[in-house]
Amino acid sequence: RLLSRLRSKSNKLFIAYINQMTQYDSEAINFVLRNVRDNDVKFIRLWFSDIVGNLKGVAITAEELESAMTRGMGVDGSSIDGFARSKENDMFIVPDPTTFAILPWRPKTNAVARMFCEILTPDNQSFEGDSRALLRRNLAKASDLGFTYYVAPELEYFYLKDSKTAEPLDTGGYFDQDPQDIATDL
């Protein structure tokens, strides 16, 4: 219902907004659809985060994916903390095809994939609480001020005594040396 109302109001505006916002092209969408077909993907989890960073999402079938990528999926924003009051509950999500990945811990037969989504308001605007849009806005502001944003992963791990318990191998912490840090020579 929501998407029908939005599209009937301004289909051209909706399409223009999606194209401008995400710059997705048919090649990216076709790549995802081909991978879904070739890898026996049956369900796609459409992920987004709430205003405090908790992962949220809905699952759709492979048959619903093309429509979701080109038209969006309606969601009830009032059911998600911090998104909308009950009188302003209509929102929708649009999967980003560049984030498509098959979940490796799921079975290969009837596979499951995931995609992160853009969150839009009923007037086709980026939702202020969408963490992806917020990051883009802040990176643009930082760039306008002459800053460059750099990011890199920091890998951390723990050695455990065995695979049955979560008991650490030693009591060493940051910068500790022998005898507390038994794992030094591993």
Segments the model singles out, each with a brief description of its role:
Residues 1-20:
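N-terminal amphipathic/basic-hydrophobic helices that include classical n-h-c signal peptides
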